[in-house]
Amino acid sequence: MTRSLRVVATMALLHLSIGPSPARAVAPPPVDRAALPAASSPAPPGPTEQTGRCVGSAPARITRGEQLSSLNLPTVWPLSRGSGQLVAVIDTGVARHRLLPHLLPGGDFVSSGDGTQDCDGHGTAVAGLIGGAPTSEFSGVAPDVGIMAIRQSSNKFRLTSDLSPD
């Protein structure tokens, strides 16, 4: 072996025997508390008015569908059904419904509610797919998960200042 090859091999063995340097904890950056905005409850930026009728609640009788059959949920549920987890549905709100027993109010940026009103129906449908209670016809992916309802938009409400005069 040539001298340079022996030096390279020795250096490689030395490097491998020492190993990588340990990770170091990095302290979070300092926060200037004076620069933070004051805490406030969720609310729209101004007064709002309802401009359309709310959609009705979901039908009492759900027809069997194959929408989620490819997920094969019964094989996953022994591992987890979402218990102890919380999912925020930030949408058009989530209406209280018997198939959403773990619904929690989270806030309303559209009107003066708590997020558990849904005039558009979209947020409620999304929450049902995530955590709808199982029936013989349908179940959400994680039926034991908590759902926090946050209404951030609605086609049925407008800021009063945005309404054109009649």
Where are these regions (language model features)?
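Protease zymogen maturation seam
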Residues: 11-85, 98-99
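Short intrinsically disordered, low-complexity coil segments enriched in acidic
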Residues: 1, 165-166
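Subtilisin-like serine protease catalytic core
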Residues: 75-87, 92-105, 114-164
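N-terminal substrate-binding region of glycoside hydrolase catalytic domains
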Residues: 111
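Bacterial N-terminal signal peptides that target proteins for export
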Residues: 1-8
